[in-house]
Amino acid sequence: MNIQALLSEKVSHAMIAVGAPADCEPQVRQSAKAQFGDYQANGMMAVAKKMGMPPRQLAEKVLEQLDLSGIAAKVEIAGPGFINIFLAQEWLSAQIDGVLTAPKLGVAPVAPKTVVIDYSAPNVAKEMHVGHVRSTIIGDAAARTLEFLGHKVIRANHVGDWGTQFGMLIAFLEKQQSEHHEAIALADLEAFYREAKRTYDEDPAFAERARGYVVKLQGGDEYCRKMWKQLVDVTMTQNQLIYDRMNVTLTRDDVMGESLYNDMLPGIVADLKAKGLAVESEGATVVFLDEYKNKEGEPMGVIIRKKDGGYLYTTTDIACAKYRYETLKADRVLYYIDSRQHQHLMQAWTIVRKAGYVPDSIPLEHHMFGMMLGKDGKPFKTRAGGTIKLSDLLDEAVDRATKLVAEKNPDMPADELNALANIVGIGAVKYADLSKSRTTDYIFDWDNMLAFEGNTAPYMQYAYTRVLSVFRKAGIDAEAVSGVTRIVDDREAALAVRLLQFEETITQVARDGMPHVMCAYLYDLAGLFSGFYEHCPILNAEDEATKQSRLRLALLTAKTLKQGLDTLGIETVERM
């Protein structure tokens, strides 16, 4: 059910009937204030200007042609030519009944596309840290949302599994295996990497062996490949534990590391040279881009192969985009990578387009995000200034949630308390991130994210259980609600309109990759339910028909909160 689309079609039809151009934009929007109706059509200003008439005069003509019979209770013109639409309560009632029985909360099926989503992308032989939080959480919400709408989503975990550091890591793994058991060697990845680097810096013979292993690994040496694969496997096994713990849908099957594109790189460099896009410059292979200028105002040179024959991230990203279009058959590609990589990606994609590897009709979208900051406004780190491990962050979230839940439920059995604390704690970390616009930096604050009031996961999870408690108090199964919806009160109507705006909301999230829009919608919905619950008695309604009608609104609220939170990757519980 997409009210905005329905009204846009009706208003557009009326505008064309009075002489507006066929491509006119009715600009139908949800009204910000109740006095302006449920929806406003704001497109008269721009169209009237083109038609050479006052906007109000155009609005009056449009109103004469606008057929909203059975949909709107009244339509009026405000100000210079805004059209305010007040939806009819009978129509809202019928739509609620339709949505309650429809699959997917009445969200219309889409023409399915293949969407590749690049997110998370941790590095091999390093533990995931807070720097991976935003890409992982926001990317996963986008994947869940697009999948819910019916698209074929291919998750691409672009793991950092290649590069010169692997010579050092293989040499150190070999050293550790000769001295200890290999499982011990890789038990603490962070310590393993640190020790490998220290040995490399301090032991010239070790460094020499490490450099030799880089060449061998790149040449496909069997022993080096075996050691390299061991490093990748141990890392991804540890990362999978974190993904599962965070309720993130990534699996081992989604790993498409940098190494996947190695065999494509020589061919791409040769092809770019053959097409006249790349040239030799001071021993390196370079693409000069007119679209980007250096400090001297000359076309910027983007190196795709170094003097020593080594390739760069740009070369890999060119291959990666080509692979996603040609092999994965992507109709759309989303990259959840931080904003500092923007120019690098734009340069790679400019080369991709010029070479004809991905046509202009296939969007390559950088859904960038800001940084996670501490309360001091600086990048979020440990007290000692180190990087915070993601596993430590999740441990602290669960510890804090355990104390919080235990205070509110002193008699809760330990296993139930533990399960609930995990859902609340992990949900709080995820929701705190998702509820902020991804394009801005955000302050990480434990007290705010674990609060039971405001736009937080604990509040939203509690709001869901509060709706369910209505059915528990009534002693009825939620799905056993009968009767029909019969909206007669303004608060019922306001709740109904918001419930019917779920499709508009999820469509916007899918289009823009902005999960905070869903968070804001759900928070608003929970607030409207609260007002409805306080002013419209449900179990003590004046008659059985009213009671059933209000139970139907409560049921759809519960379903919408649960589904909305699920698209964000936030788990719900039946009681708190």
Curated annotation (Swiss-Prot):
Catalytic activity line of the entry: tRNA(Arg) + L-arginine + ATP = L-arginyl-tRNA(Arg) + AMP + diphosphate
GO molecular function annotation: arginine-tRNA ligase activity; ATP binding
Pfam short name (any one): Arg_tRNA_synt_N
SUPFAM superfamilies: Anticodon-binding domain of a subclass of class I aminoacyl-tRNA synthetases, Arginyl-tRNA synthetase (ArgRS), N-terminal 'additional' domain, Nucleotidylyl transferase
Top-level taxonomic group: Bacteria
Gene Ontology biological-process entries: arginyl-tRNA aminoacylation
Transmembrane region(s): none
Major localization class: cytoplasm
InterPro entries from the UniProt entry: aa-tRNA-synth_I_CS (IPR001412), Arg-tRNA-ligase (IPR001278), Arg-tRNA-synth_N (IPR005148), Arg-tRNA-synth_N_sf (IPR036695), ArgRS_core (IPR035684), DALR_anticod-bd (IPR008909), Rossmann-like_a/b/a_fold (IPR014729), tRNAsynth_Ia_anticodon-bd (IPR009080)
Motif ('HIGH' region): 122-132
Disulfide bonds: none
Subcellular locations according to the entry: Cytoplasm
Annotated EC: 6.1.1.19
The entry's keywords: Aminoacyl-tRNA synthetase, ATP-binding, Cytoplasm, Ligase, Nucleotide-binding, Protein biosynthesis
A GO cellular component annotation in the UniProt record: cytoplasm
NCBIfam families per UniProt: argS
Family: Belongs to the class-I aminoacyl-tRNA synthetase family.
Known partners and oligomeric status: Monomer.
Name of the featured protein: Arginine--tRNA ligase
Organism in which the protein naturally occurs: Erwinia tasmaniensis (strain DSM 17950 / CFBP 7177 / CIP 109463 / NCPPB 4357 / Et1/99)
